[in-house]
Amino acid sequence: MTTEKLIVLNKDEDTVSIVNLEAKAVEKTIATDHNPHEIVVTPDGKKSYIACSLGNVVDVMDNDTFQITNRIKHPDFSFPHGVGLTKDGDKLYLASTYSEKVFIINTKTDEIEKVIPTSQKYSHMISFSPDGKIVYIPNIGSNNITVMDVETEEIVNHFPVGPGPEGVAVHPNGEHIYVANQDDDTLFVIDTKTLEVLHKRRVGGTPVRLVFSPNGKYALIANRQSGDVSVIETEQNINGQVRPWEIKRLPVGVWAGGIVFNEAGTYAYVANNKTNDVSLINMNTLKEEQRIDVGIHPDGIAYLKQ
């Protein structure tokens, strides 16, 4: 029997909440290292990698037992944060914010294979292109994005964006990069080939996370300061003009953070840092249906189908 779960990281109590989406309740709580912040689940669903930022460690969790089975450490971990996996799941990319480095980790051995300095300020997140060939790394303090080639495992470019970029994702069609700039409350829509900024949009206060629905129809942006989610219709057609447009701003809890969709794209789930809960958003009605209580200061969130 298939079950759907959320894995929610509770930063201020050093735990993970396992939420059963059928029961809409926490079914298990697991202790982690200090300050679990960001998470990624392997493509086969067997493992999760949890960046514990203030603990300077990456916890490896077995998703069958929900036990921490390994801890990855390195002397140059300094607020390890953004995590992402290659398309085959064989390599984990980790951004270490204050040491301004990217670590490439073999997921079969959980050994660090390569350390790459970005030479940029506060390298914070990891976002892969849909084809898995490119990694985009927002540098909050340098107001730019670092581009890495996955095949060569080398940095190939940096390009400027707005102030304080954090939430970054590539549209499923591979043609546009969306960047949420938290310091001036804007969204940039950028051509992946030319890196030209095609559109600039004002969104909510302090946008920090950005995800696309599986079909690419919507982008959701978590606005931390204004406690809401900007719903962007990626191809709104007005009198023959197709453009991305904010069609709704959904109130959620205080300090909206991590967002994830279910596999079908029918629901999105938003971790509310300061109300200690997760908002369930119905993507057909574009309304918050309910909230699920979790631990203290939830932020990183992942969807798991077993």
Task: Please report, for each region that a protein language model flagged, where it lies by residue.
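Predominantly soluble domains enriched in secretory-pathway, periplasmic, or organellar proteins
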Residues: 1-306
